[in-house]
UniProtKB/Swiss-Prot annotation:
Pfam families: SelR. Its EC number is 1.8.4.12. Keywords: Metal-binding, Oxidoreductase, Zinc. GO terms for cellular component: cytoplasm. GO terms for biological process: protein repair; response to oxidative stress. GO terms for molecular function: peptide-methionine (R)-S-oxide reductase activity; zinc ion binding. It is an enzyme of class 1 (oxidoreductase). This is Peptide methionine sulfoxide reductase MsrB. The active site is at C128 (nucleophile). Binds 1 zinc ion per subunit. The zinc ion is important for the structural integrity of the protein. Its cofactor is Zn(2+). It comes from Burkholderia orbicola (strain MC0-3). The gene is msrB.
Amino acid sequence: MSHDSDDKTFPYQKDDAELRRRLTPMQYEVTQHAATERAFTGEYTDTEDAGIYKCVVCSTPLFESGAKFHSGCGWPSYFKPLNGEVIDEKVDYSHGMVRVEVRCNHCGAHLGHVFEDGPRDKTGLRYCINSAALNFESRPENE
């Protein structure tokens, strides 16, 4: 699923040649063509350090470690984004399913999908995000 046919315009306009140079092949395919990394292979699946997860394309802060939980699905999971402005959600009809795609609201990078099977004592949502779409910035818990 490529974002080429998408009508939404995002504030950060990406240069494809620059992205191909800067990103790994997996990061490029995930963020620009909505590929999915294999379950349990992502760099941040089991990361428990305190910090912020940012968009690998534009460095927009997306999720904080306090919202991360172990869902057992094989991808980093969060019960909420950093705030309501950083995520764009779009219905995804690919692969014979109906899901909600999650994209960076600043650059349009594909991040993953959101499902309604997250922790009931929090938001009830599970943002299932590809590690390849993220960069992690470690920081002390009290910041």
